[in-house]
Amino acid sequence: MRIIAISYLRPFWETNPDAEQPLKSWVDEVKKANWSQPSDIKAQYRSASILKNRRVVFNIKGNDYRLVVSVAYRFQAVYVKFIGTHAEYDLIDAETVEMES
């Protein structure tokens, strides 16, 4: 899978250093993945939440951080839509959130 907007992850782990290794591991795993449907994601990440609009929520570092992505299965692309703490995640709508520029 190709990860789009991966550049948003670096500033996050620079301010949350304990998220760096878990996020880098997630990036490595996703780049090697070949997902064609939501069940492929669930097979690899049992704790991932599949939402409407091709959105998926991943727990990072246990449940300390949340990563929301949109998956374009046909194009083998994952778009980063949100990265934040669990508390920050509780304040957003994961089905519509977009990264701020």
Q: How would you name each of these model-derived features?
A:
Residues M1-D64, A72-A77, H86-S101:
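Basic, Lys/Arg-enriched alpha-helical interface segments
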